[in-house]
A protein has these predicted regions:
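Signature of Gram-negative outer-membrane beta-barrel scaffolds
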Residues: 1-50, 63
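Transmembrane beta-strands of outer-membrane beta-barrel pores
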Residues: 2-4, 24-30, 44, 57-63, ...
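Gram-negative outer-membrane beta-barrel transporters
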Residues: 13-19, 111, 116-119, 139-220, ...
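Outer-membrane beta-barrel channels and translocator barrels
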Residues: 15-17, 45-49, 91, 103-106, ...
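Transmembrane beta-strands of outer-membrane beta-barrel proteins
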Residues: 20-22, 38, 51-55, 94, ...
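Membrane-embedded beta-barrel scaffold of Gram-negative outer-membrane proteins
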Residues: 45-47, 53-54, 87-139, 143-147
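C-terminal beta-barrel architecture of Gram-negative outer-membrane proteins
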Residues: 174, 185-246, 259, 264-268, ...
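C-terminal beta-signal and adjacent terminal beta-strands/loops
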Residues: 212-220, 243-322
Length: 322
């Protein structure tokens, strides 16, 4: 496949505090033909540079590589099926961002808020639900929308303490045949925080970070599947201590996943039978519930929504070479 292209953009200074950036990209795909991708960005900043507004809109084009991007296709637990020839995904996206810096005597407060909206056509999504033994890939016969808002608060103090907290509320949905469904393995709410403090006398920096994830809709293997349809709320917390040595080396040590959170033990269905040797199938390849498999399950790791690694210690060195 050949993909020559050209990109042109022009930045226009409307005045001292307003800028407009216009661009267009042209690609010729030897399989899919001519592709045009325009974009526009607007920026306004206050005279003192403590307030900034950014607006952007643009079009995107992407040829999906399923086996590189979706590792679920490589687990071997399900056969992979493609419906027809996959068309490239296209999208239109818009974003509005506002930043406000507030300067105090001994600290700086930064507020950062964004609204984003992306409309996809020809979206390629894995279908886990039509057949529990397959992952079916096809272009969506409808549309997919990802929209949401995010807010970040960042505070930096002169004494070496810095605080960061952010939250994102999203609606990622698929609309097909006028039916709206929530996309699998996507959370509506997520949050992040970071607390950093430098002990100048010791040359040590302490970083405490964490993430909060809301429930995700998960792929089940059928109506008899005993696992929950949605994941629980969960938090991942980490702490790290960094010691700087003579400006050329950093020694760091820390703990990941302080609360030792792991997904439920039954997240991988029938993990004890990865080749389905004890599973009975009918002539159409559907699972038949039996005495040793009353829920009619097969080996399947697609339900796993976060890392199976619990609490763990790490240690390392960073060298700076001038």
């Amino acid at each position: 496949m050949d993909l020559p292209g050209i990109f042109i953009q022009d930045e226009i200074n409307l005045n001292e505090w307003q800028k407009l950036l216009l661009g267009i990209r042209y690609d010729y795909n030897s399989i899919h033909g001519n592709v045009f991708s325009p974009r526009a960005n607007y920026k306004w900043s206050s005279i003192d540079k403590n307030e900034i507004i950014r607006l952007s809109v643009g079009n995107g084009f992407r040829v999906a590589n399923v086996f590189t991007e979706d590792h679920a296709a490589l687990t071997g637990s399900r056969s992979v099926e493609f419906k027809d020839n996959l068309k490239p995904e296209t999208s239109w996206n818009g974003n509005a961002n506002y930043i406000k810096n507030i300067i105090f005597k001994e600290s700086i407060l930064t507020l950062d808020g964004s609204f984003f909206y992306t409309y996809f056509s020809n979206r390629i999504l894995p279908d886990y639900e039509s057949n529990s033994n397959k992952i079916i890939y096809s272009n969506l016969d409808g549309k997919s929308v990802s929209k949401g808002i995010s807010l970040n608060v960042d505070v930096m103090f002169q004494n070496g303490l810095s605080l960061l907290a952010g939250a994102t509320l999203m609606d990622v949905s698929v609309i097909e045949k006028q039916v709206k469904t929530r996309q699998l393995l996507t959370e509506r709410f997520s949050s992040v925080w970071s607390i950093s403090y430098r002990l100048k006398s010791l040359g040590v920096t302490i970083d405490y970070t964490g993430n909060v994830y809301g429930p995700m809709r998960l792929p089940l293997l059928g109506r008899l599947d005993p696992r929950d349809e949605y994941s629980q709320w969960f938090i991942i917390q980490n702490i790290q201590f960094t010691k700087k040595i003579r400006n050329i080396m950093e020694l760091y040590v820390g703990v990941k996943n302080l609360l030792n959170f792991t997904p439920p033990s039954n997240s991988i269905a029938r993990a004890f039978d990865p080749f389905d040797k004890k599973v009975q199938f009918d002539n159409e390849g559907q699972v038949i519930p039996s005495s040793n498999n009353p829920n009619g399950l097969t080996f399947d790791p697609s339900y796993v929504f976060t890392s199976n690694q619990g609490i763990r210690l790490f240690l390392g060195l960073n060298f700076t070479i001038y």
